[in-house]
Amino acid sequence: MAETILIETKTAGGNCRSYLMAGASYLGILCFVPLLMSRDDEYVYFHAKQGLVLWMWSILAMFALHLPGIGKWLFGFSSMGVLMLSVVGLVSVALRRTWRLPLISHVVALI
């Protein structure tokens, strides 16, 4: 009963613009560029939603710094998680695939 991580999209076209926009989705606040400019491309929109959730996670992690004692640890682990998932997302774009990222796929489905 393992959930599939690879999703087949109908419009994973071969143009370079789609891949550049999908790659920009995982670069922090740049996730808004493909989110707003490529809503009609299913491939780019999928990656933009995942990038948006990663960006929101990194913003929320900054608030953990205000917690006494455990805040720095929580921020460090969250930042490492966001960095690793962003790299996995960039690799999936480089391989022209659509992978659901493990920790955030349920939140992305709600968007």
From Swiss-Prot:
Lumenal side of membrane: 39-50, 94-111
Ranges that cross the membrane: 18-38, 51-71, 73-93
Cytoplasmic side: 1-17, 72
Description of the deletion phenotype: Normal magnetic response, no change in magnetosome size or number. A double mamF-mmsF deletion has a normal magnetic response, slightly smaller, fewer magnetosomes. Deletion of any 2 genes encoded in this operon (mamC, mamD, mamF and mamG) decreases crystal size regardless of the protein combination. Deletion of the mamGFDC operon leads to smaller magnetite crystals in irregularly spaced chains, but no other phenotype.
A GO CC term attached to the entry: magnetosome membrane
Record key words, sorted: Biomineralization, Magnetosome, Membrane, Transmembrane, Transmembrane helix
Post-translational modifications: Subject to cleavage or degradation; identified by N-terminal sequencing of proteins that are about 103, 92 and 15 kDa in size.
Membrane topology of the entry: Multi-pass membrane protein
Induction remark: Part of the probable 4 gene mamGFDC operon.
Taxonomy, superkingdom: Bacteria
Subcellular location: Magnetosome membrane
Coiled coil segments of this chain: none
Purpose: Plays a role in regulating magnetite crystal size; partially redundant function with MmsF.
Family: Belongs to the magnetosome MamF/MmsF protein family.
Subunit organization: May form homooligomers.
UniProt miscellaneous comment: This bacteria makes up to 60 cubo-octahedral magnetosomes of about 45 nm in diameter which contain membrane-bound crystals of magnetite (Fe(3)O(4)).
Protein name, entry field: Magnetosome protein MamF
Underlying gene: mamF
